[in-house]
A protein has these predicted regions:
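Phosphate-binding P-loop
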Residues: 1-5
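Short hydrophobic/aromatic beta-strand immediately N-terminal to the Walker A/P-loop
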Residues: 7-9
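The conserved Walker
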Residues: 14
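Conserved lysine of the Walker
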Residues: 18
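Hydrophobic positions on the alpha1 helix immediately C-terminal to the Walker A/P-loop
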Residues: 21, 25
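Conserved nucleotide-sensing/catalytic segment adjacent to the nucleotide-binding pocket
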Residues: 32-38, 44-93, 104
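ATP-dependent NMP and nucleoside kinases share a basic, alpha-helical "lid"
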Residues: 96-144
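C-terminal accessory "lid"/substrate-recognition subdomains
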Residues: 142-313
Length: 313
């Protein structure tokens, strides 16, 4: 590659929805255009060693944070890496694999924003923060069906990990440009989850107000400003017509990426069944908007789409 990769970070606790979101984006962007890196591959210890040391994979000391940052910097610069592989199926490490840079790098995992060195390497930073009750439900479903655990084992592991979740994972939310919480709607199915977004001014977001009916419109999208941040609530039961209007508003700002228009936005699977969520589709489209805004900025000689962040401390 002669130009750098545009880098998206997706951080959240275990079973927060990172893989679902990542797969959808890769599907739309095309596998030939996306390098996907899961930072779980940078665990320092395998499952047996973690048990012997009484340490969880959520703890920074259980991960090669320095190697993670070095590899992400190489990919961002358009350089290949030789990446470790962690196999969730049995909790062991596989052989190293060569990973080549592509137009986009999607990096998901537990500790992607833990250090300042890592945070500087992303063009777009997303954090997934579902309610704990819902996340626990998702983790039980996933780990029992795909990783061979019993329900009691999963719940016990969640309890054991909670101190590290509180200490190391959830605090990273403060560094995200976009925070996404999927929320259950009473009486609705899993493909009808509401989505609540916090949009921070570190990115220039689309103007959603042009297609909104008002802050308290029943059954519609709600928007508010709190402490300089935009809070957006997208109902899972959003009707298709209103969803299309909002999608068209975002696509209007992506005229240079119109070739990516796809009916597959918002698709996800539960077991072997394919579902579609309007709220998930809108979130994925918003992410595409920011990725291509950063792409255009870099192509014109800029640094990306980020706005200057305030100096703290």
């Amino acid at each position: 590659m002669t130009t750098r990769s545009i880098t998206l970070g997706i951080v959240g606790d275990s079973a927060a929805g990172k893989t679902t979101l990542t797969r959808g984006l890769v599907r739309v962007l095309g596998e030939d255009n996306v390098t996907h890196v899961c930072v779980d591959d940078y665990h320092r210890y395998d499952r047996k060693q973690r048990a012997e040391r009484n340490i969880t994979p959520l703890h920074p000391d259980c991960n090669h944070m320095d190697v993670m940052a070095q590899h992400l910097a190489h990919l961002r610069a358009g350089e290949p890496i030789l990446k470790p592989v962690y196999r969730h199926e049995d909790g062991t490490f596989g052989p190293l694999v060569r990973v080549d840079p592509k137009q986009f790098a999607v990096v998901d995992g537990l500790l992607g924003y833990y250090t300042e060195e890592l945070r500087r390497l992303y063009d777009v930073r997303l954090f997934l923060a579902p309610p704990e009750e819902l996340r626990r439900q998702w983790k039980v479903q996933r780990d029992c069906s795909r990783r061979g655990y019993t329900t009691d084992q999963v719940l016990a592991e969640l309890d054991r990990r909670e101190p590290d979740s509180e200490a190391f994972i959830r605090p990273q939310q403060r560094y995200a440009d976009i925070v996404v919480s999927f929320l259950p709607t009473p009486g609705s199915e899993q493909d009808r989850l509401d989505a609540e977004l916090i949009l921070r001014p570190t990115l220039r977001h689309p103007d959603f107000r042009s297609v909104l009916d008002g802050e308290a419109a029943e059954g519609g999208i709600r928007i508010s400003e709190i402490d300089g941040e935009t809070h957006l609530r997208i109902p899972g039961c959003l009707d298709a017509e209103r969803a299309r209007a909002l999608e068209e508003m975002i696509w209007d700002g992506l005229h240079f990426a119109s070739h990516l228009r796809s009916d597959r936005l918002g698709e996800f699977t539960i077991g072997t069944d394919l579902h579609r969520s309007e709220s998930l589709a809108l979130i994925q489209l918003l992410i595409l908007y920011h990725l291509f805004t950063a792409t255009a900025s870099v192509a014109l000689g800029g640094e990306g789409a980020r706005t200057p962040e305030p100096v703290t401390g």
